[in-house]
Structures are given as structure tokens and as C-alpha cells.
């Protein structure tokens, strides 16, 4: 399952979620503004900015369509 760690008022987060929906890729969203207990997990994965997208051992940050396509 794909997980998107997002934040409020984050344009790249919105773009990632829209791209995944348009390509019919199911995902869970964790909003780290609303669920701050996940901030430490994101930092431990080596990321400092949202969105962070994960699937199994694959993780990346930002709106990157070429990487998003690998999630299908």
C-alpha cells in the first residue's frame, strides 16, 4: 500500500494525491499537521519536507511523476 505523508496548505501534497487518484493508485494519507506523532517517523526516514511517499522499502519526497509511476 502506498502511504502519502502530507501537510496542510501543501501544493505538492495536493498534486501527488491528485496524480495518484487520476492513475487509480490506492493510497493512505497521513497528515502530519493533524497527526504530529508521525513527524519523527518522517525524519527518521531521512526526509525534512512534505510530501513523502512510501511503498514497502521505496520512499521519496516531492511531486515526481516519474517516481510516482513506479508505484503502479
From Swiss-Prot:
Record InterPro entries: GlrX_NrdH, Glutaredoxin, Grx-like_ET, Thioredoxin-like_sf
Q: Which CDD domains is this protein grouped with?
A: NrdH (cd02976)
Domain of life (superkingdom)? Bacteria
Lipid biosynthesis as UniProt keyword: no
Q: Which UniProt keywords apply?
A: Disulfide bond, Electron transport, Redox-active center, Transport
- Sample GO molecular function, one term: electron transfer activity
What Pfam families is this protein classified in?
Glutaredoxin
Q: Look up keyword Electron transport and say if it applies.
A: yes
One of this protein's GO BP terms?
A: cell redox homeostasis
Disulfide cross-links: 10-13
What are the Glutaredoxin domain coordinates in residue numbering? 1-72
Q: Please give the NCBIfam families that the UniProt record associates with this protein.
A: GlrX_NrdH
Role this protein plays:
Electron transport system for the ribonucleotide reductase system NrdEF.
Q: Which family does it belong to?
A: Belongs to the glutaredoxin family.
Q: What is this protein called?
A: Glutaredoxin-like protein NrdH
- What organism does the UniProt record list as the source? Lactococcus lactis subsp. lactis (strain IL1403)
Upper taxonomic lineage: Bacteria, Bacillati, Bacillota, Bacilli, Lactobacillales
